[in-house]
Amino acid sequence: MATKMAGAAMNLAKRESSSLCGKLETDIEIKASAGKFHHMFAGRPHHVSKATPGKIQGCELHEGDWGKVGSIVFWNYVHDGEAKVAKERIEAVEPEKNLITFRVIEGDLLKEYKSFVITIQVTPKRGGPGSVVHWHVEYEKIDDKVAHPETFLDFCVEVSKEIDEHLLNEE
């Protein structure tokens, strides 16, 4: 696996930042197919809580349709030991690339960040089974006292591993 524990995610992550704006990204190798993993976020994000009950408690559709650009999704999750919420607008969906992009428009993340955009892209592994999940987070901090969202990226790695395990158990 590309990462062994959540903390190891930062060893693979690239961070670019200039003052308040930044980008974090990491790759996680999974055993599930790229299409199935992508479909968990694009087609049935309300099932993510079944795969990761200790991290994501729920996902509700507030506007639009699952997996459609412009739709609004509301998440209940636990990050850094605290219950949190996020309302996100789907900004891009490219099924042929197994890509989806969410922009946070309300919630706990916006207490520290002016903007927060999450892109998930899953690609099949070359020459073998499994896939690679690429998480890309772009953000603008409210001020320079706010930390880069490295623990959020760790959270994404853990969620990816639990979804992978869930998808493999569904087969």
From Swiss-Prot:
This is MLP-like protein 31. One of its GO terms (biological process) is defense response. InterPro entries: Bet_v_I/MLP, MLP-like_ligand-binding, START-like_dom_sf. CDD domains: Bet_v1-like. It comes from the Eukaryota. Pfam families: Bet_v_1 (PF00407). Belongs to the MLP family.
